[in-house]
Amino acid sequence: MKSLRIFIPVFRFILKKLSKGYGIGKKQPVKTVFKLMDQFFRADIVDVHGHKMLLPKKGFDEYSTLGIYGEFDTSSVENLINKGDFVVDVGAAIGYYTLILARAVGPKGLVFAFEPKIERFEILKKNIELNGYTNVILENKAILPSEIKPTFFNVKNQQGGIRLIKKFETKNENLEPVMTDVIDLDTYFINKNKQNQISFIKIDVDGPELFVLQSSKSILNNKHLKILIEWDKNLSKKSDC
Protein backbone atom coordinates (compact mmCIF):
# COMPACT_ATOMS: atom_id res chain seq x y z
CA MET A 1 0.00 0.00 0.00
CA LYS A 2 2.96 2.34 0.52
CA SER A 3 3.34 2.56 -3.25
CA LEU A 4 -0.05 4.31 -3.37
CA ARG A 5 1.47 7.31 -1.57
CA ILE A 6 1.82 8.82 -5.07
CA PHE A 7 -1.87 9.82 -4.75
CA ILE A 8 -1.29 11.85 -1.57
CA PRO A 9 0.00 14.96 -3.43
CA VAL A 10 -3.24 14.96 -5.44
CA PHE A 11 -5.25 14.95 -2.20
CA ARG A 12 -3.10 17.79 -0.83
CA PHE A 13 -3.70 19.87 -3.97
CA ILE A 14 -7.47 19.37 -3.86
CA LEU A 15 -7.62 20.18 -0.13
CA LYS A 16 -5.59 23.37 -0.60
CA LYS A 17 -7.90 24.54 -3.40
CA LEU A 18 -10.99 23.84 -1.30
CA SER A 19 -9.73 25.27 1.98
CA LYS A 20 -8.58 28.71 0.74
CA GLY A 21 -7.19 29.52 4.18
CA TYR A 22 -10.35 28.63 6.11
CA GLY A 23 -8.74 25.84 8.13
CA ILE A 24 -10.74 23.02 6.55
CA GLY A 25 -7.83 20.70 7.27
CA LYS A 26 -8.56 21.08 10.99
CA LYS A 27 -12.20 19.99 10.71
CA GLN A 28 -13.01 16.59 12.18
CA PRO A 29 -14.28 14.94 8.95
CA VAL A 30 -11.06 15.92 7.18
CA LYS A 31 -8.98 14.74 10.14
CA THR A 32 -10.77 11.39 9.89
CA VAL A 33 -9.79 11.17 6.22
CA PHE A 34 -6.19 11.96 7.23
CA LYS A 35 -6.18 9.09 9.70
CA LEU A 36 -7.57 6.64 7.15
CA MET A 37 -5.04 7.73 4.54
CA ASP A 38 -2.26 7.49 7.10
CA GLN A 39 -3.39 4.00 8.10
CA PHE A 40 -3.21 2.69 4.54
CA PHE A 41 -0.40 4.76 3.03
CA ARG A 42 1.96 5.38 5.95
CA ALA A 43 5.68 4.96 5.27
CA ASP A 44 8.51 4.80 7.79
CA ILE A 45 10.28 7.82 6.28
CA VAL A 46 8.31 10.60 4.61
CA ASP A 47 8.98 13.96 2.96
CA VAL A 48 7.84 16.74 5.28
CA HIS A 49 8.27 20.34 4.12
CA GLY A 50 11.60 19.68 2.44
CA HIS A 51 12.99 17.26 5.01
CA LYS A 52 13.14 13.50 5.35
CA MET A 53 11.45 12.45 8.59
CA LEU A 54 11.36 9.12 10.34
CA LEU A 55 7.94 8.66 11.95
CA PRO A 56 6.85 6.47 14.87
CA LYS A 57 4.40 3.70 14.09
CA LYS A 58 1.42 5.83 15.13
CA GLY A 59 0.62 9.53 15.39
CA PHE A 60 1.78 12.57 13.43
CA ASP A 61 -0.87 11.91 10.76
CA GLU A 62 -0.49 15.36 9.17
CA TYR A 63 3.21 14.80 8.62
CA SER A 64 2.45 11.61 6.74
CA THR A 65 -0.45 12.90 4.67
CA LEU A 66 -0.13 16.69 4.30
CA GLY A 67 3.64 16.95 4.44
CA ILE A 68 3.38 20.07 6.62
CA TYR A 69 2.20 20.82 10.15
CA GLY A 70 0.35 24.12 10.38
CA GLU A 71 1.07 26.04 7.21
CA PHE A 72 0.61 29.48 8.79
CA ASP A 73 2.77 28.72 11.85
CA THR A 74 5.43 27.15 9.66
CA SER A 75 5.69 30.15 7.34
CA SER A 76 5.63 32.52 10.33
CA VAL A 77 8.60 30.77 11.91
CA GLU A 78 10.53 30.78 8.65
CA ASN A 79 9.94 34.52 8.27
CA LEU A 80 11.03 35.29 11.84
CA ILE A 81 14.41 33.53 11.68
CA ASN A 82 17.61 34.96 10.20
CA LYS A 83 20.84 33.28 9.18
CA GLY A 84 23.20 33.00 12.13
CA ASP A 85 20.47 33.19 14.80
CA PHE A 86 20.66 31.20 18.03
CA VAL A 87 17.22 29.70 18.63
CA VAL A 88 15.49 27.34 21.06
CA ASP A 89 12.90 24.58 20.50
CA VAL A 90 11.27 23.57 23.80
CA GLY A 91 9.14 20.47 23.29
CA ALA A 92 10.82 19.43 20.07
CA ALA A 93 8.93 16.11 19.74
CA ILE A 94 10.37 14.28 16.70
CA GLY A 95 11.86 17.40 15.16
CA TYR A 96 9.48 19.14 12.76
CA TYR A 97 10.32 22.66 13.95
CA THR A 98 13.87 21.72 14.93
CA LEU A 99 14.57 20.84 11.30
CA ILE A 100 12.92 24.02 10.01
CA LEU A 101 14.94 26.10 12.47
CA ALA A 102 18.19 24.32 11.56
CA ARG A 103 17.63 25.12 7.90
CA ALA A 104 16.66 28.73 8.65
CA VAL A 105 19.63 29.64 10.88
CA GLY A 106 22.16 28.06 8.53
CA PRO A 107 25.60 26.68 9.41
CA LYS A 108 26.60 29.78 11.41
CA GLY A 109 23.51 29.59 13.63
CA LEU A 110 22.58 27.17 16.40
CA VAL A 111 19.42 25.35 17.42
CA PHE A 112 19.00 24.12 20.99
CA ALA A 113 16.24 21.48 21.05
CA PHE A 114 14.76 20.06 24.26
CA GLU A 115 12.57 16.93 24.29
CA PRO A 116 12.00 15.01 27.56
CA LYS A 117 10.16 11.93 26.25
CA ILE A 118 12.87 9.39 25.46
CA GLU A 119 10.95 7.63 22.66
CA ARG A 120 10.47 10.92 20.83
CA PHE A 121 14.01 12.05 21.61
CA GLU A 122 15.51 8.98 19.92
CA ILE A 123 13.51 9.67 16.75
CA LEU A 124 14.45 13.36 16.97
CA LYS A 125 18.15 12.42 16.97
CA LYS A 126 17.68 10.18 13.94
CA ASN A 127 15.82 12.91 12.03
CA ILE A 128 18.62 15.40 12.61
CA GLU A 129 21.16 12.82 11.41
CA LEU A 130 18.97 11.86 8.45
CA ASN A 131 19.06 15.44 7.18
CA GLY A 132 22.74 16.00 7.89
CA TYR A 133 22.44 19.00 10.22
CA THR A 134 25.42 19.75 12.45
CA ASN A 135 24.09 23.01 13.90
CA VAL A 136 21.69 21.39 16.40
CA ILE A 137 22.31 20.66 20.09
CA LEU A 138 19.87 18.08 21.45
CA GLU A 139 18.91 17.73 25.11
CA ASN A 140 16.74 14.96 26.58
CA LYS A 141 15.40 17.28 29.28
CA ALA A 142 12.27 19.10 30.42
CA ILE A 143 12.36 22.85 31.08
CA LEU A 144 11.01 24.13 34.42
CA PRO A 145 12.02 26.63 37.11
CA SER A 146 14.50 25.14 39.58
CA GLU A 147 12.12 25.53 42.55
CA ILE A 148 9.51 23.20 41.01
CA LYS A 149 9.89 19.51 41.85
CA PRO A 150 7.70 17.89 39.21
CA THR A 151 6.31 14.45 38.59
CA PHE A 152 5.73 13.75 34.92
CA PHE A 153 3.30 11.22 33.52
CA ASN A 154 2.85 9.37 30.27
CA VAL A 155 -0.75 8.97 29.10
CA LYS A 156 -1.25 5.31 28.18
CA ASN A 157 -2.41 4.47 24.65
CA GLN A 158 -1.77 8.04 23.45
CA GLN A 159 0.97 9.33 21.18
CA GLY A 160 1.48 12.68 22.89
CA GLY A 161 4.39 13.88 24.96
CA ILE A 162 4.81 13.36 28.68
CA ARG A 163 2.60 15.53 30.90
CA LEU A 164 3.10 17.55 34.05
CA ILE A 165 -0.16 16.89 35.93
CA LYS A 166 -1.15 18.20 39.35
CA LYS A 167 -1.49 15.72 42.19
CA PHE A 168 -5.26 15.26 42.52
CA GLU A 169 -5.49 13.95 38.96
CA THR A 170 -2.63 11.48 39.17
CA LYS A 171 -4.83 8.60 40.38
CA ASN A 172 -6.11 8.27 36.84
CA GLU A 173 -5.37 4.68 35.82
CA ASN A 174 -4.37 5.83 32.33
CA LEU A 175 -1.35 7.68 33.73
CA GLU A 176 2.05 6.19 34.40
CA PRO A 177 4.88 8.15 36.08
CA VAL A 178 7.96 8.93 33.99
CA MET A 179 11.42 9.93 35.17
CA THR A 180 13.12 12.72 33.23
CA ASP A 181 15.87 15.27 33.76
CA VAL A 182 14.73 18.84 34.40
CA ILE A 183 16.68 22.06 33.92
CA ASP A 184 16.05 25.77 34.29
CA LEU A 185 16.48 27.42 30.88
CA ASP A 186 18.28 30.47 32.28
CA THR A 187 20.76 28.26 34.12
CA TYR A 188 21.40 26.22 30.99
CA PHE A 189 22.28 29.23 28.85
CA ILE A 190 24.08 31.22 31.56
CA ASN A 191 26.39 28.22 31.97
CA LYS A 192 27.08 28.45 28.23
CA ASN A 193 27.36 32.26 28.37
CA LYS A 194 24.70 32.52 25.65
CA GLN A 195 21.73 33.95 27.58
CA ASN A 196 21.97 37.23 25.63
CA GLN A 197 22.30 35.58 22.22
CA ILE A 198 18.94 33.81 21.99
CA SER A 199 16.68 35.48 19.42
CA PHE A 200 13.76 33.02 19.17
CA ILE A 201 12.03 30.46 21.38
CA LYS A 202 9.32 28.03 20.29
CA ILE A 203 7.41 26.39 23.18
CA ASP A 204 5.01 23.44 22.90
CA VAL A 205 4.97 21.43 26.13
CA ASP A 206 1.35 20.31 26.56
CA GLY A 207 0.45 22.51 29.52
CA PRO A 208 3.27 24.09 31.55
CA GLU A 209 4.22 26.77 29.02
CA LEU A 210 4.08 29.47 31.72
CA PHE A 211 6.60 27.53 33.79
CA VAL A 212 8.95 27.47 30.81
CA LEU A 213 8.69 31.27 30.58
CA GLN A 214 9.32 31.56 34.33
CA SER A 215 12.53 29.60 33.87
CA SER A 216 13.65 32.01 31.13
CA LYS A 217 13.64 35.40 32.88
CA SER A 218 17.14 36.41 31.83
CA ILE A 219 16.51 35.39 28.22
CA LEU A 220 13.22 37.31 28.19
CA ASN A 221 15.19 40.51 28.75
CA ASN A 222 16.54 40.25 25.21
CA LYS A 223 14.98 43.20 23.38
CA HIS A 224 14.67 41.44 20.04
CA LEU A 225 13.50 38.07 21.36
CA LYS A 226 10.63 36.45 19.44
CA ILE A 227 8.45 33.72 20.97
CA LEU A 228 6.00 31.21 19.48
CA ILE A 229 3.84 29.36 22.03
CA GLU A 230 1.26 26.64 21.45
CA TRP A 231 -1.12 26.92 24.41
CA ASP A 232 -4.07 24.77 25.48
CA LYS A 233 -6.21 26.11 28.34
CA ASN A 234 -7.30 22.68 29.61
CA LEU A 235 -3.79 21.22 29.58
CA SER A 236 -2.52 24.33 31.34
CA LYS A 237 -5.06 23.84 34.15
CA LYS A 238 -4.09 20.19 34.52
CA SER A 239 -0.48 21.30 34.91
CA ASP A 240 -1.54 23.75 37.66
CA CYS A 241 0.01 26.44 35.52
Predicted regions and their residues:
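Glycine-rich adenosyl-binding loop in Rossmann-like folds that engage adenosine-containing cofactors
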Residues: G50-T74, T134, E139-N193
